């Protein structure tokens, strides 16, 4: 007999990360690499923790720290790939990266899909992150 674990066993449940549908359906975001889409999902997950811990700047914007070495670990990639993936999210308008200098990690400000120009999900009929 095999040791099969079925999904209905709540004590064996695992944590998961939500991956927003709009990243795959909205024309604005379909060109993003899959790594960038997954990293954005990890950033959104970490945003919840930042919100709970009260990490907001003087304007009330939630920020987080995601050092490059952690991105490398999470995505199982090299340093340059991690940098490029973060940059890809920045160019897509999904995050703002603020350098702090003096050896401090960059602050990452996650943005909502609604903040990205040329993205009108109501007109396009594509889903929202809650779908």
Residue ranges and their predicted role:
Residues 1-37, 53-62, 73-74:
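Positively charged, structured surface patches that bind polyanionic biopolymers
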Residues 29, 34, 47-110:
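Winged helix-turn-helix DNA-binding recognition segment
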Residues 22, 100, 113-115:
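Generic structural motif
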Residues 2-3, 112-131:
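Charged low-complexity intrinsically disordered patches
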